[in-house]
Amino acid sequence: MASSTVSVVLSLFLLLLTQANSANIQSFSFKNFNSPSFILQGDATVSSGKLQLTKVKENGIPTPSSLGRAFYSSPIQIYDKSTGAVASWATSFTVKISAPSKASFADGIAFALVPVGSEPRRNGGYLGVFDSDVYNNSAQTVAVEFDTFSNSGWDPSMKHIGIDVNSIKSIATVSWDLANGENAEILITYNAATSLLVASLVHPSRRTSYILSERVDITNELPEYVSVGFSATTGLSEGYIETHDVLSWSFASKLPDDSTAEPLDLASYLVRNVL
């Protein structure tokens, strides 16, 4: 998968949205971040045009026990209770995770859809997104995690990408070899026609790519309106720390006029033609 694939596919998605009925489209794109566009929680800040999710000392060294979240300031409607229509959506972002030690990392970053007004959850291995490794529908949260530390209670025994539904215990995972201090280009899509959530990650410097997918019925797992954004945490001790910077971010969704309208089939297109 070429390093430009993420941006090319998102551009295609935006074009499809534009050519479709312009109603019910929600989209935004940031190459430089500014605070008024975001709800910042915990240690998250906007610094030099990037989202810096976890705390960093003046010397550039990350701090332990840091938690930061950043969500787009406007709610996103992902389905319509009155019509039964469900939105297809895609998001693309570039992140960089850097750790002082090449041997120890913690804990990771997640892209999350959470209830509007949600507050940070537990620190450390819970990534600030969940409180438990037991499924709890009242959490009303779906996330894709990029987990740099294996917690023995619920994680596989390696760094991994995971899809989380109302629990920090992932319903699907794939092993991931983090490129320390290098950019990762990430694309996540949701296909309303198939309920398929697809996540892909590329390290352009290594020409390595990872892909993960799982079916998720978001009408059963999420509220009608959500906040979309990021959450990240560092480990609880000095030996397990890392930075979490979001360098760019785009998001687009299309909610059909009714439940019978044909949704965008982007996820299937990716699997067949790109990934």
Swiss-Prot record:
Site residues by UniProt (Cleavage): D265, L266
InterPro entries membership: ConA-like_dom_sf, L-lectin, Lectin_LegA_CS, Lectin_legB_Mn/Ca_BS, Legume_lectin_dom, Leguminous_Lectin
GO molecular function: D-mannose binding
Disulfide bond residue pairs: none
UniProt keyword Transferase present: no
Signal peptide: 1-22
Gene3D superfamilies: 2.60.120.200
Glycosylated position list: N136
Keywords for this protein: Calcium, Glycoprotein, Lectin, Mannose-binding, Signal
Segments passing through the bilayer: none
PTM field: Subunit II may arise from subunit I by proteolytic cleavage at the C-terminal end.
Kinase listed as a keyword: no
Role played: Metalloglycoprotein, containing Ca, Mg, Mn, and Zn and the carbohydrates galactose, glucosamine, mannose, and fucose. It agglutinates erythrocytes of blood group A1. Has a high preference for GalNAc over Gal.
Oligomeric form and interacting partners: Homotetramer.
Family (UniProt): Belongs to the leguminous lectin family.
PANTHER family: CONCANAVALIN A-LIKE LECTIN FAMILY PROTEIN, LECTIN
Protein name as catalogued: Seed lectin subunit I
Organism: Vigna unguiculata subsp. cylindrica (Horse gram)
Lineage of the organism: Eukaryota, Viridiplantae, Streptophyta, Embryophyta, Tracheophyta
